[in-house]
UniProtKB/Swiss-Prot annotation:
Source organism of the structure: Mycobacterium avium (strain 104)
Enzyme Commission numbers on file: 2.7.4.6
GO BP annotation list: CTP biosynthetic process; GTP biosynthetic process; UTP biosynthetic process
Pfam families: NDK
UniProt family annotation: Belongs to the NDK family.
Necessary cofactors: Mg(2+)
Protein name (Swiss-Prot/TrEMBL): Nucleoside diphosphate kinase
InterPro entries linked to this entry: NDK-like_dom (IPR034907), NDK-like_dom_sf (IPR036850), Nucleoside_diP_kinase (IPR001564), Nucleoside_diP_kinase_AS (IPR023005)
Length: 136
C-alpha cells in the first residue's frame, strides 16, 4: 500500500551536512520525494508539530532545538513509507536503540539531537503533512 510520510532533517543533520547522505538513503530504500523544502521553523509551527509533548519537561528544549537552525522538510511516498522510513531512521536513542546501518545508528549521538523525524502513523502523517505542506 502506498503511503505518504513527513520526514524532517533536523537542525543537527543540516548543520553537520548530512542532508545529501540522508536523502540518498531515502531514495536507495525505494521511496520517492514528493516535496522537499529547506526552511526555518517558527515557534508556532514547532509548537503545533510537537503539541503532543506540551506540558512535558523537555517541551521547551524541543522547541528551542527545532527552531535553532534550518530544517529540511519532505513528503516521502512509497509502499509502507511510514514504517520504511522509521526503519531507515533507527531507534530514537541513537546510542542505545539505533542499530548500525540506520541513520541514527551511524550518525547520531544524543536522543535530542537524533538527526531526523518521521511520522509514526497514518494519522500523524496526515496531520504533519498538512502542517508543513498545507498546499500538498
Amino acid at each position: 500500500m502506498t503511503e505518504r510520510t513527513l520526514v524532517l532533517i533536523k537542525p543537527d543533520g543540516v548543520q553537520r551536512q548530512l542532508v545529501g547522505e540522508i536523502i540518498g538513503r531515502i531514495e536507495r530504500k525505494g521511496l520517492t520525494l514528493v516535496a522537499l523544502e529547506l526552511r526555518h521553523v517558527s515557534q508556532d509551527l514547532a509548537a503545533q508539530h510537537y503539541a503532543e509533548h506540551e506540558g512535558k519537561p523537555f517541551f521547551a528544549s524541543l522547541l528551542e532545538f527545532i527552531t535553532s537552525g534550518p530544517v529540511v522538510a519532505a513528503i516521502v511516498e512509497g509502499p509502507r513509507a511510514i514504517a520504511a522510513f522509521r526503519q531507515l531512521a533507527g531507534g530514537t536513542d541513537p546510542v542505545e536503540k539505533a542499530i548500525p546501518g540506520t541513520i541514527r545508528g551511524d550518525f547520531g549521538l544524543e536522543t535530542q539531537f537524533n538527526l531526523v523525524h518521521g511520522s509514526d502513523s497514518v494519522e500523524s502523517a496526515k496531520r504533519e503533512i498538512a502542517l508543513w505542506f498545507p498546499d500538498a
